[in-house]
């Protein structure tokens, strides 16, 4: 019996229609069918160890994992509503894949090499800082910075005192709570935070820094995770509050901000211009850090951009170029960076080994205290409380640059990265100085 010629045509049409329906589901701009094909390709590459240990291999793995995990987290009810959405889900799931040995170690090495070794993180952060600062109105930027820094520093100081007092109440002692919870959680991350902090402690105590570092690392991990979750919660709970600036940090300046943030049409040449200018500021910060090693490079980067903006040293064409490049990086690489954080920085084994109820309580106290204090002070200093709590508060409990990105991604406030970095880097440097003095008396 012969098939009717129309039957095969109808079957082909139905398949195409089904594929078309699936392709309407888009993950970061890519249809589901095409995404599934690339995902299968990635799984085969990883399982056959043919994923290149290069920038290309890292980008392919991190972008695909980051986008799909973020998509899932953003659509899962509990994560979406209460646990920081796609940002937290991406970081947690990639960290769990590593902890359970589902993800091979060579993939972790490839991801870490791209983010830290090749310093893609540095490019991402400087692009974001430059973009967000140049996008702001000049007068508004200076007014916001002058009000923001006192809020950040006072919040950190008061939070440390609260942690110490709670440490006494729950039986671990004031000194322990300050040295092993307050200082590391607000020190500015790992490389610029607890690594030099462990050296300071080790020198004062006459012990090896490796043992000290193993005690400090869990604090940074849990503090970072709680900060990300809290940022998502705060932005959601206070969504309709008068204290929510919806991404604007300075109260009463929304009209000026809207005028300053006019739409910039994409231009291929300007994207390249924006890239090299962003890198130029990174080089300025790096070179000044070599001359003054006691001051973090990002502090110099922020200062150089603020001065450039304040004195109008860059024509609008170049400012727009930087803004444009920063937007491209944020929209396309944020999820990849979050996946990289989970793969290479969030060690679940270390975190679980350190868990005790006192440890968890003190980390929670740090999060709650710095959120409430910074929100209250922010309101007094003319900032929106929600934005103050996230940038002057929670960002100072995060894991440095990567933590700031995750905190702001969870709260959908990536445009405030400059303020998060400002408080985190300058505040972190102050923490190291204060810790160096305190450890002499508290050891």
UniProtKB/Swiss-Prot annotation:
Listed Pfam families: 2HCT
Effect of residue 425 to C: Exchange is severely affected with (S)-malate as substrate. Affinity for divalent (S)-malate is strongly decreased. 20-fold increase in affinity for monovalent 2-hydroxyisobutyrate
Induction: Induced by the presence of citrate in the medium.
Entry GO terms, CC: plasma membrane
Keywords: Antiport, Cell membrane, Citrate utilization, Membrane, Symport, Transmembrane, Transmembrane helix, Transport
Keyword set includes Transmembrane: yes
Reaction catalysed by this enzyme: (R)-lactate(in) + citrate(out) = (R)-lactate(out) + citrate(in); (S)-lactate(in) + citrate(out) = (S)-lactate(out) + citrate(in); citrate(in) + H(+)(in) = citrate(out) + H(+)(out)
Written domain comment of the UniProt record: The 46 C-terminal residues contain structural elements that interact with the R groups of the substrates. Interchanging the 46 C-terminal amino acid residues of CitP and MleP alters neither the specificity nor the affinity for the di- and tricarboxylates malate and citrate. In contrast, changes in substrate specificity are observed with monocarboxylates.
Family from the record: Belongs to the 2-hydroxycarboxylate transporter (2-HCT) (TC 2.A.24) family.
Protein name per the record: Citrate transporter CitP
Organismal lineage: Bacteria, Bacillati, Bacillota, Bacilli, Lactobacillales
């Amino acid at each position: 019996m012969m098939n009717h010629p129309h039957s095969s045509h109808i079957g082909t049409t139905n398949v195409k229609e089904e594929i078309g329906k699936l392709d309407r589901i888009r993950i970061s701009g890519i249809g589901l069918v095409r995404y599934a094909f690339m995902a299968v390709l990635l799984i085969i590459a990883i399982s056959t160890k043919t994923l290149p240990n290069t920038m290309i291999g890292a980008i392919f793995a991190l972008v695909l994992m980051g986008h799909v995990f973020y998509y899932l987290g953003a659509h899962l009810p509990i994560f979406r509503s209460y646990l920081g959405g796609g940002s937290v889900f991406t970081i947690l799931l990639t960290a769990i894949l590593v902890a359970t040995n589902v993800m091979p170690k060579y993939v972790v090495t490839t991801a870490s090499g791209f983010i830290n070794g090749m310093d893609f993180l540095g490019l991402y952060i400087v692009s974001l800082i430059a973009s967000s600062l140049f996008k702001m109105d000049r007068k508004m930027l200076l007014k916001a910075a002058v009000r923001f820094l006192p809020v950040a520093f006072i919040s950190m100081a008061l939070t440390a005192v609260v942690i110490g007092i709670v440490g006494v109440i729950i039986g671990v002692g004031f000194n322990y709570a300050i040295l092993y919870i307050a200082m590391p959680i607000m020190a500015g991350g790992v490389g610029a935070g607890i690594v030099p902090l462990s050296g300071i402690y080790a020198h004062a105590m006459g012990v090896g820094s490796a043992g000290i570092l193993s005690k400090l690392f869990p604090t940074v991990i849990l503090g970072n995770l709680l900060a990300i979750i809290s940022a998502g919660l705060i932005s959601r709970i206070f969504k309709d509050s008068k204290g929510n600036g919806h991404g604007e940090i300075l109260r009463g300046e929304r009209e000026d901000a809207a005028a300053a943030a006019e739409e910039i049409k994409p231009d291929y040449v300007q994207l390249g211009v924006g890239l090299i200018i962003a890198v130029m500021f990174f080089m300025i910060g790096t070179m000044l850090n070599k001359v003054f090693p006691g001051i973090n490079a990002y502090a110099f980067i922020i200062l150089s951009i603020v001065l450039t903006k304040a004195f109008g040293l860059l024509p609008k064409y170049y400012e727009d170029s930087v803004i444009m490049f920063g937007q491209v990086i944020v929209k396309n690489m944020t999820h990849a960076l979050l996946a990289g954080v989970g793969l290479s920085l969030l060690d679940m084994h270390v975190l679980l080994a350190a868990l005790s109820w006192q440890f968890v309580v003190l980390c929670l106290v740090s999060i709650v205290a710095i959120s409430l204090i910074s929100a209250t002070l922010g309101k007094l200093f003319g900032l929106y409380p929600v934005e103050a709590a996230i940038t002057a508060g929670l960002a100072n409990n995060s894991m440095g640059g990567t933590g700031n990105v995750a905190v702001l991604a969870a709260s959908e406030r990536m445009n405030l990265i400059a303020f998060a970095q400002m408080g985190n880097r300058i505040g972190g440097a102050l923490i190291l100085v204060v810790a160096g003095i305190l450890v002499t008396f508290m050891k």
